[in-house]
Amino acid sequence: MKRRKFLTHTTTLATLTILDPLKFGVVTDPVVHPLRLIIDADTANEVDDLYAIARALLEPRLGIVGLTSAQWHTNPRTPNDSVGESQRINEEILKLMGKSAIPAPQGANFPMVNEQRPQPSEAATFIIEQAMRIPEGEKLSIAILGPATNIVSAILLEPKIIPKLSVNYLGFWYNVATNTWSKREFNTNNDPNAVNVLLNTPNLEFRVMTATTSQHLVFEKTVMDQLLKGKGGIGDYLINRWETYDRFWKETDKEKTKWTMWDVAILEALAYPELAEEKEVMTPHDNLARTIKVFTKIDVAGMKANFYKAFSR
């Protein structure tokens, strides 16, 4: 996920070094009933998706039942097969982390052309199948890190899954004080029709981690180097992505000393609700008038500490 507005946040190496050393993937906070979750990501679009997915795969509070790939097309350097690129990276992450048994169906390569016509895909079919297996009274959580094409296509193809879903979307800008929304945001622009379906669907549980809130989670390259570089496997894979990705749209910080971890924020908030503040608000004025949930504040220090702990050796 890419944004054009970045907020500087300082993190010191001292914060990292005081954490107890752990090996990747060690369960330190066992949960009897982890959150049943599908992650849907436009992974190849940016850098933070990779960090978020890897972090989630190490989290015992999250029971990842699937990792689906998403398209994007508004980036001027978007490849013709954007979803294929996301799919490739998803599969590489799963392999590096020994998680290849987790299903990784591919999503649609194009956005919805209107609010009534879905884009069928393996990912949409997978979401339907998983949702239909959910026992009465329970829900399947979806974390959307990119455009909402796959999830909304699943809903349109099989509306029976609506009461079985808890949809969590990373997108929009939102002003808490004035209760005003802006849809001029990267994920939303990559499938505005899909987002409108989410907003306009009665009885769909819908929660948003806005760009306004998630922009505050900023990682420093020096800290990530100490945490991940030279460790092999997923650690070096993540560092390589940071170092080789061309952040062409950003005029400042050409050395890429910091990176905004939008996607990490939503997954940390789902795993650790105590690290975020949530509020019920009204939908945008041009959508069905109903209440949805919005994360209005995050504990940046707490989320960083969780990330460091998960990846420390």
Regions found by a protein language model. Give the residues of each.
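N-terminal acidic, glycine/proline-rich low-complexity segments
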Residues: 7-313
